[in-house]
Amino acid sequence: PWWRDDLFYAHGDAYFDNAHGSLLAMAIENTSVPAEILKGTFTGDTLVGMGSVNKQRNLALITNQTSTGTFYFTYIFPGYYSSSADKRIAANVLYRVAMPSTSGIANGSVVRSARSKNIVYYTNDNAVYAHNVLANSNFPTAALFTVGSSSEKIVDMVFSDDDNLIYVATNDTSASMPGSLYCYDTQTNALRWSKQHITGRIVKALFRNK
């Protein structure tokens, strides 16, 4: 979901159609079928991951163009869909750039966004990378941090409500109890705590505030 600048609730939801390489959007209060936006921008692409940034005002997407294997980072304003025609604001692409091989992105990367900030996190095996959307095409060339051992693979990441902590779930196929959980400080990128090999194979991680 994303918000509009003058709203304090989610304005719309976005969906990606891998079969047609298209981004769909729909206002929360709208019960009609989601409509394609930015038609032609993602033709031939499949989604690696997407999320809202900049206090949920904009969307960032990482896609893979299947014909060339090129990964693209697309930063967009998703638009405003009012029932009043004079208040509608069209979606637009802020930038779309190819991600270099040195950026660490791969098919199967977990992609998550710090919604209140301008940062998109993505993974490669047990490594976590971070891209600030304000940096445009200046992608990281080294991991922000690595999690656990090289035999572990990150399967999910989730943030605390204030985005100051990131919880990273991994699986280690070489362990009898493969699932581990790590907590990192997003301000310092330091490990706060870890709980290694505490469960079976992790499929998804969820955060619940006490």
Residue ranges and their predicted role:
Residues 28-31, 79-81, 133-136, 185-188:
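Short loop/turn segments that connect beta-strands within beta-propeller blades
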Residues 33-41, 90-103, 139-148, 190-196:
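A short beta-strand motif characteristic of beta-propeller blades
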Residues 16-26, 67-77, 126-132, 175-182:
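Structural motif
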Residues 1-4, 10-14, 43-59, 99, ...:
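Repeated scaffold domains used in trafficking and secretory/extracellular systems
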Residues 67-69, 80-84, 88-104, 116, ...:
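Polar, enzyme-active/binding microenvironments
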Residues 6-17, 24-25, 57-65, 118-123, ...:
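Short beta-strand elements that form the blades of beta-propeller/WD-repeat-like
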Residues 124-125, 129, 133-134, 139-172, ...:
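Intrinsically disordered, low-complexity segments enriched in Gly and acidic/Ser/Thr residues
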